[in-house]
């Protein structure tokens, strides 16, 4: 079980459009970071690369759902013999 240093709303993070990464200041002087892709995949833990602290990111997962669509199953019911 992870012990979070803090829980922080995504709105409090700084967003870098070039790297598609969210940053939040860490007490050690570096930044916690989490990518947009991580959020789209349901991740909610931002890490600091300079120390062992982690924070829980509070965000609406529905807003970060990946835009991928899954095709409907085929309705072709023809069976193929092996």
Swiss-Prot record:
Binding of Fe cation, residues: 26, 28, 48, 51
Biological process per Gene Ontology, one example term: protein histidyl modification to diphthamide
Reactions listed under catalytic activity: [3Fe-4S](1+)-[protein] + Fe(2+)-[Dph3] = [3Fe-4S](0)-[protein] + Fe(3+)-[Dph3]; 2 [3Fe-4S](0)-[protein] + 2 Fe(2+)-[Dph3] + NADH = 2 [4Fe-4S](1+)-[protein] + 2 [Dph3] + NAD(+) + H(+)
Cell location: Cytoplasm; Nucleus
UniProt xrefs under PROSITE patterns: DPH_MB
Xref: InterPro entries: DPH3/4-like, DPH_MB_dom, DPH_MB_sf
Keyword Transmembrane: no
Span of domain DPH-type MB: 4-60
GO MF entries: ferrous iron binding; iron chaperone activity
Keywords: Cytoplasm, Iron, Metal-binding, Nucleus
GO terms for cellular component: cytoplasm; nucleus
Protein's pathway: Protein modification; peptidyl-diphthamide biosynthesis
The keyword NADP is assigned to this record: no
Cofactor(s) of this protein: Fe(2+)
Domain observations: The DPH-type metal-binding (MB) domain can also bind zinc. However, iron is the physiological binding partner as zinc binding impairs the protein electron donor function.
Family: Belongs to the DPH3 family.
Subunit structure: Component of the 2-(3-amino-3-carboxypropyl)histidine synthase complex composed of DPH1, DPH2, DPH3 and a NADH-dependent reductase. Interacts with SERGEF.
Known function: Required for the first step of diphthamide biosynthesis, a post-translational modification of histidine which occurs in elongation factor 2. DPH1 and DPH2 transfer a 3-amino-3-carboxypropyl (ACP) group from S-adenosyl-L-methionine (SAM) to a histidine residue, the reaction is assisted by a reduction system comprising DPH3 and a NADH-dependent reductase. Acts as an electron donor to reduce the Fe-S cluster in DPH1-DPH2 keeping the [4Fe-4S] clusters in the active and reduced state.
Protein name, as recorded: Diphthamide biosynthesis protein 3
Recorded name of the encoding gene: DPH3
